[in-house]
Amino acid sequence: MNYNPFQWTFKSEQTANEFNEHVEKSVPFYKEIHKIVKIIGGFFVEENTNVYDIGSSTGNLLKGMSNILKRNANYIGIDNSIYMNQVAMNDADSDNIKIISEDVQDFKFTNASYITSILTLQFINIEDREKTIKNVYQGLNKGGAFILVEKVNGEFVQSHEIMNQIYHDFKLENGLTYEEVIKKSQSIRGVLKPLTLKQNKRMLEKAGFKDIDTWFKWNNFVGIIAVK
């Protein structure tokens, strides 16, 4: 793999071409998370509604949901990386998949039965994150679900430090070099803005969600479901 941590950015052509390989080495249980998100979708995706993926990257989640659920719904990805969107559309094998190049905080969701955000909102500043989640809530149909997967901070300093060290060990064990791990961490300083699990849930509550639960937790990665 030719991953170059010195030039890492979501919007580069290199990142788009190598994203799938890199993310599986960097995110614990990444394939399993996608599998569960697709299974949960089976409980919520309805005919003639919209399914949105915020930060759709190479479109794998959307394509997987479209192929597995076999429902007459529109599967819409939102991503501001032109190169990611090109990869997603090149691999799209269904007419009901659409990719939109736009910043999510400016996007209006409509007629949505299911909205997902997999490790995306953590890269958006807090004010825009709150705006996005509010837009998600308003765009969901009653009974629709929002799936949020995020890297989180520990609830106190000691737990945060322990979780970070465990996560660094995970990446090294998965084949990334020490230099890649360090340089990637340096490259996202000031860009990655994780919250704690409690803070994420409070943000969902502030947007209007009342039914909120955690369906996945590994070290400093969590999956949350919020139903309107």
UniProtKB/Swiss-Prot annotation:
Enzyme class: transferase
Species assigned in the record: Staphylococcus epidermidis (strain ATCC 35984 / DSM 28319 / BCRC 17069 / CCUG 31568 / BM 3577 / RP62A)
CDD domains in the record: AdoMet_MTases (cd02440)
Protein name: Carboxy-S-adenosyl-L-methionine synthase
Listed Gene3D superfamilies: Vaccinia Virus protein VP39 (3.40.50.150)
Residues given in the record as S-adenosyl-L-methionine binding sites: Y30, G55, S56, S57, D79, N80, D103, V104
Reactions catalysed according to its record: prephenate + S-adenosyl-L-methionine = carboxy-S-adenosyl-L-methionine + 3-phenylpyruvate + H2O
Keyword set includes Transferase: yes
One GO-annotated biological process of the protein: tRNA wobble uridine modification
Family label: Belongs to the class I-like SAM-binding methyltransferase superfamily. Cx-SAM synthase family.
InterPro entries: CmoA, Methyltransf_25, SAM-dependent_MTases_sf
The protein's role, per its UniProt record: Catalyzes the conversion of S-adenosyl-L-methionine (SAM) to carboxy-S-adenosyl-L-methionine (Cx-SAM).
HAMAP family the UniProt entry points to: Cx_SAM_synthase (MF_01589)
Short name of any one Pfam family annotated for the protein: Methyltransf_25
MF annotations from Gene Ontology: carboxyl- or carbamoyltransferase activity; S-adenosyl-L-methionine binding
EC identifiers of the protein: 2.1.3.-
Keywords of the record: S-adenosyl-L-methionine, Transferase
Signal peptide: none
